[in-house]
């Protein structure tokens, strides 16, 4: 390498990869790797930007997905690129593989896409609609004949287990007990305990609104799994790239619409920007005419999932992984805001093109 590497470690989950770079450069035909920059925004995998004589590339160490699924997802990505979806086409090694293994560590490589991430409140209404159109196009392309050999047609019925209020309270009490047993609680521990107490109050007040069936409304099909501002690149007002394709799964389309909107236009700000949400939903419906009741079902299920789940605390206390700590308190504020305005939120998701 001709330039010193930036710090490429990030806690215990990422190894220093300098020893792997020579092999990766040879495998992918990159020549000498001139610089390697760690990208801290990825929450689940290791990501780096490589500068080489062949150009700039995004290198991902595959850590959060089984290798067979990663290979399938990379093959799907190539098909989507052929269909005109704004994605990077995976690079192949000298042996024709999209995954390179080095000392038991698996990597994939994609040409670097120039662009920036834009939180939802930075988007104009037209851009919010464009994002909805793109999500609709992704759903159409993931479920057409081009990808059928990789992603077999999905069933119209999909089980959607609903956490009981009792189970949600039990989980809250478990985390409260863990915090109470700490010898030296941190500021995060103190704030988490307060938030858990407030969550239990919400559970007591709104438990009777939990979804009554364990089957989600259709249509269902193959979905991206994490379309939101961290995984969408913009340049000159246009979407130029969709990233992070390692969560392709069969889900209700409405589930991904609801999740994308609440992460893109809310969540970290403590409220949902309803006008942009409506524009996004109308854009999506211009491509995929999902019925209003189906999307309403998805929105209610997502609300209850947030009400009854504590995934950031699972990471923090059960896995000793603090990488998502910063998401917990904003999510709690958003949940309280959403719970008090459930009808307004549903109206936003009923928008038509």
Which residues does each predicted region cover?
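Active-site activation/catalytic loop segments of kinase-like enzymes and analogous catalytic loops
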Residues: 254-289, 304-322
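ATP/Mg2+ or Mg2+-diphosphate-binding catalytic cores
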Residues: 3, 9, 173-178, 286, ...
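Juxta-kinase regulatory segment immediately upstream of eukaryotic protein kinase catalytic domains
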Residues: 2-35
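ATP-binding pocket architecture of kinase catalytic cores
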Residues: 52-152
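ATP-binding glycine-rich phosphate-binding loop
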Residues: 28-52
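A cross-family kinase active-site recognition segment
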Residues: 125-195
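An alpha-helical support segment within catalytic cores of ATP-dependent transferases
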Residues: 16-26, 147, 173-224, 351
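Active-site acidic catalytic loop and adjacent metal/ATP-binding pocket
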Residues: 43-53, 58-59, 90, 204-255
